[in-house]
Design a protein with these regions (language model features):
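Juxtamembrane boundary at the C-terminal end of a transmembrane helix
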Residues: 186-196
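Hydrophobic transmembrane alpha-helical segments in integral membrane proteins
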Residues: 1-25, 195-196
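Membrane-proximal helix-loop-helix units in multi-pass membrane proteins
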Residues: 83-153
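A generic, lipid-embedded transmembrane alpha helix
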Residues: 47-70
Length: 196
């Protein structure tokens, strides 16, 4: 009997581990939103912050769904497993930055977000690179599904992250989160058809 697990045995294990990390990120976002509803006057709300929370919630769900393509992976290594868990952790960190434990030292969520934007957009820029590596790991069949828009998202996303990292202008940040959300909706509509 061969004690080495098969790819079919490793995939569910990895999906559980990644799902746990993603679930923690979703929990943080939902708890912050619930806290806003429970105590509406405790901290100042922000459209910018809420849009990023919504965008990241969608990002976590998309990540969880996209990772299902790993079932086609024939060879698993510890490096691949570590990479995938690391990628999930970066998404959790983004959720943690959007759902701080205490913002008493700040003038609401937007003030906190803009003052912590360098951390947020540095990690977000990193996720664009991680997503590219993740797509390459999944291989040819997965990669063939994409058109030019997938390959444009990385340089455009990186430029937008650099702008957001550098400037605290609210209008710029609203435009960037708007572009990010539109791209997420495009991906959702284009790739997630449930018929057939």
């Amino acid at each position: 009997m061969d004690p080495t697990p098969t790819a079919a045995e490793i995939f569910p294990h990895m999906r559980v581990v990644m799902g746990t990390v993603v679930g923690l990120g979703i929990t943080r976002l939902l708890m912050t939103f619930a806290g806003m509803i429970q105590h509406p006057h405790r901290n100042r709300w922000s459209t910018l912050h809420l849009l990023w929370m919504g965008s990241l919630l969608l990002e976590l769900i998309l990540f969880w769904w996209w990772e299902f393509a790993l079932f086609r992976l024939e060879f698993w290594t510890f490096g691949v497993a570590l990479f995938l868990i690391g990628y999930a952790i970066t998404l959790f960190l983004l959720a943690a930055l959007l759902s701080p434990d205490n913002i008493a030292d700040y003038d609401g969520y937007e003030d906190f977000f803009l003052k912590r934007r360098r951390w947020f957009f540095s990690i977000l820029a990193g996720t664009f690179v991680l997503d590219t590596v993740d797509t390459l790991i999944k291989g040819g069949r997965h990669l063939e599904r994409f058109d030019w828009s997938y390959f444009v998202q990385v340089p455009v996303g990186m430029v937008l992250c650099v702008l957001a990292w550098r400037y605290a202008d609210r209008r710029l940040h609203l435009a960037i989160v708007g572009i990010h959300l539109l791209h997420q909706f495009y991906l959702t509509i284009r790739f997630f058809t449930f018929a057939g």
